[in-house]
């Protein structure tokens, strides 16, 4: 029999249906010659630092850097039962071969391989590589299974990425958390992304607006401008000089221009436009596209390609017809699609661009949630636009001369609306006010024409600061980060991947380093402080983009994983050495949230409220009172802040409601600190006489 392992249950069900594995079991489906099971995402992950040495359970500066000599992996606790199912199936004597059917990409490969290795499986496996969950795509995929070894380099790149994130995250987070006594999460990709938010916020906060003036002259429907005059006095002088005077059309230039249709959607571009049009976060869009993929209505979402392959031409034509029939917004659209525009085999690696599927023909679109309908409309609109006709217009540039001053204006006249007609139809459905096109149609004039008695006016303007990032513009910045560091022959990958960028943004928000205000993403005070204290090698988008490029080269077999990780380890070690201590003032940078409850009985330093504990602020002192320590837990009590304060103040505290298994009733006692300076603080109990 053949064991097929998918990434999640819904995908497994789609595959099982095609293979005829319809008999449901505990954690898998069986039928014919197949058993189909699933992973629930990451079942096996890199072990936490404390798994290597129990002393790492407590965060200490002196333990850094932590770099495993031999990497350990552990089963995710809440998914242990499914791992047992998979492990047992892999060892089942009936199973002679496996099929890796996790998502066709770097992370999907890692999910399967870690389970395969952790289970100690050595049976041969094939790889299912598909871009759609339609029945026809699954059948075709199983007819063209590939040898699993063909993806060894993909796995190597995925594992290298995971290890690099572990090394930078564990050491960077522990280093700055122990130095500043506040949990400061540092990430290989997360931190440079935060740095971009902070840099933009800094430019906005230090921006000083400057006033300038524009002078306008015109007659009838024709008005031209002299822009960016520095002073009001000069602008008024120019206007006064031109008022009621004669202006001559000194220059007239007409040029026919075209705007090519946009490319198809990759994930990042789809996330950007969903944010711009609907206000969806990157994560919301990814979740919606993933759901539509699992419903077989969209192709694979985590793609970085905006093209399809030439063997998809007939399918693309079919899908375009289905979009016009099934999506009411486009029911009146008549198109003659140019499929060649979106076809390029050389620009499709793992997956082609995101498209609707032919399964859309069978779907009652109105029965879908509104959010899913919006994504389908967006993807459908882009497919029709991308294969539509060019937008053509005539641009006219006119210069007016008046009293030795030159005033200019531009106008446009649409010749063929082309693909923009579909885009305008889509935008009209949103019922949101679009910005007026600054270039309007101009009246018919000729070079040398004279305008008698023109009117003149002055308007006041101010320079504007940069805009705060939205998820749209941040995704764009992440995608192009560090591009100027590479030569023209290097394929640029930016910060993160299409699959990970949404999660990175969410982590920044959840960790309290960034916040959403409307559509804007703004760094918090802690976020700004964190970027200020971190060195450039951690905050530099260019360096992280270079790492991402190296991972891609590992995947292609052009770079060595060990060399890459050695560089990460070296950088991390240098980082720790660069921060041997902080001044008291610097250590208080994040200190506004720290609460002192007493003095340390060992060294006299302040004792602060921590996460689940009360710790000595002196890094050299190990004194710490844990809320859930063995002594208090055995008596079904928690060491509260009130108790901790009294223990530090008096050395003892009267505690009520203590439990003992020997008696049914609770009792009271005096708890004393019995600290001998060891690793753990001890207590002793006294009773009233």
Residue ranges: model-predicted function:
Residues 1, 99-104, 181-183, 254-263, ...:
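Conserved short loop/turn motifs at secondary-structure junctions
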Residues 1-162, 166, 465:
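Intrinsically disordered, low-complexity regulatory segments
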Residues 2-3, 90, 118, 173, ...:
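Basic, low-complexity terminal or inter-domain segments flanking catalytic cores
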Residues 9-16, 33-36, 40, 76-87, ...:
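Amphipathic alpha-helical transducer elements in NTP-driven molecular machines
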Residues 93, 135-217, 254-258:
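C-terminal or mid-to-C-terminal helical accessory/interaction module adjacent to the motor/catalytic core
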Residues 221-223, 253-254, 324:
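Phosphate-rich ligand and nucleic-acid binding surfaces
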Residues 232-265, 271, 542:
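Metal- or metallocofactor-binding catalytic centers and their adjacent structured scaffolds
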């Amino acid at each position: 029999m053949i064991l097929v392992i998918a990434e999640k249950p819904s995908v497994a069900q789609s595959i099982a249906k095609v293979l005829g594995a319809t008999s449901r079991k505990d954690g898998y489906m069986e039928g014919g010659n197949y058993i189909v099971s699933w992973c629930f995402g990451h079942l096996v992950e890199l072990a936490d630092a404390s798994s290597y040495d129990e002393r790492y359970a407590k965060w200490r500066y002196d333990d850094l850097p932590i770099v495993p000599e031999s990497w350990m992996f552990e089963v995710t606790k809440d998914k242990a039962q499914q791992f047992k199912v998979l492990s047992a199936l892999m060892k089942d004597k009936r199973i002679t071969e496996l099929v890796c059917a996790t998502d066709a990409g770097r992370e999907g490969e890692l999910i399967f391989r870690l389970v395969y290795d952790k289970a100690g499986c050595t049976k041969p496996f094939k790889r299912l590589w598909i871009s759609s969950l339609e029945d026809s795509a699954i059948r075709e995929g199983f007819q063209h299974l590939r040898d699993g070894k063909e993806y060894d380099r993909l796995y190597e790149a995925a594992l290298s990425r995971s290890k690099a994130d572990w090394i930078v995250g564990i050491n960077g987070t522990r280093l700055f958390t122990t130095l500043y006594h506040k949990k400061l999460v540092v990430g290989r990709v997360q931190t440079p992304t935060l740095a971009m938010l902070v840099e933009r916020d800094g430019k906005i906060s230090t921006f000083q607006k400057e006033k300038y003036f524009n002078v306008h002259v015109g007659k009838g429907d024709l008005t031209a401008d002299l822009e960016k005059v520095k002073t009001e006095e000069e602008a008024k002088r120019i206007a006064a000089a031109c008022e009621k005077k004669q202006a001559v059309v000194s220059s007239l230039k007409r040029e026919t221009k075209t705007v090519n249709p946009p490319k198809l959607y990759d994930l990042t571009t789809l996330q950007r436009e969903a944010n711009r049009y609907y206000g969806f976060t990157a994560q919301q869009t990814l979740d919606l596209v993933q759901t539509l993929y699992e419903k077989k209505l969209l192709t694979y979402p985590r793609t970085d390609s905006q093209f399809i392959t030439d063997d998809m031409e007939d399918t693309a034509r079919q899908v375009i017809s289905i979009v016009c029939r099934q999506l009411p917004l486009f029911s009146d659209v008549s198109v003659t699609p140019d499929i060649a525009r979106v076809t390029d085999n050389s620009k499709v690696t793992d997956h082609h661009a995101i498209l609707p599927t032919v399964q859309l023909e069978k779907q009652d679109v109105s029965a879908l949630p509104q959010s899913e309908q919006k994504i389908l409309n967006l993807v459908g609109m882009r497919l029709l636009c991308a294969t539509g006709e060019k937008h053509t217009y005539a641009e006219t540039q006119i210069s007016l001369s008046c009293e030795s001053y030159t005033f200019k204006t531009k106008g446009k006249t649409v010749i063929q609306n082309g693909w923009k007609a579909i885009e305008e139809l889509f935008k009209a459905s949103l019922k949101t006010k679009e910005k007026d096109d600054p270039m309007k149609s101009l009246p018919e004039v000729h070079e040398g024409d004279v305008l008698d008695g023109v009117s003149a006016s002055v308007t006041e303007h101010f320079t504007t600061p940069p805009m705060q990032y939205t998820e749209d513009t941040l995704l764009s910045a992440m995608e192009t980060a560090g591009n100027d560091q590479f030569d023209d022959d290097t394929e640029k990958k930016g910060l993160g991947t299409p699959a990970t960028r949404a999660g990175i943004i969410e982590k920044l928000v959840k960790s309290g380093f960034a916040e959403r205000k409307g559509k804007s993403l703004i760094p918090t005070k802690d976020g700004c402080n964190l970027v200020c204290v971190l060195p450039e090698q951690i905050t530099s988008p260019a360096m992280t983009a270079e790492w991402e490029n190296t991972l891609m080269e590992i995947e292609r077999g052009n770079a060595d994983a060990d060399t890459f990780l050695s560089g990460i380890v070296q950088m991390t070690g240098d980082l720790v050495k660069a921060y041997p201590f902080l001044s008291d003032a610097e250590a208080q940078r994040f200190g506004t949230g720290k609460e002192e409850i007493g003095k340390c009985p060992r060294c006299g330093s302040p004792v602060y409220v921590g996460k689940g504990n009360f710790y000595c602020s002196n890094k050299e002192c190990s004194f710490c009172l844990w809320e859930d320590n063995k002594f208090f837990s055995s008596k079904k009590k928690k060491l509260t802040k009130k108790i901790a304060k009294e223990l530090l103040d008096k050395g003892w505290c009267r505690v009520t409601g203590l439990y003992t298994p020997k008696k049914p009733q609770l009792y009271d006692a005096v708890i004393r600190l019995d600290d001998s300076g060891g690793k753990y603080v001890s207590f002793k109990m006294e009773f009233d006489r």
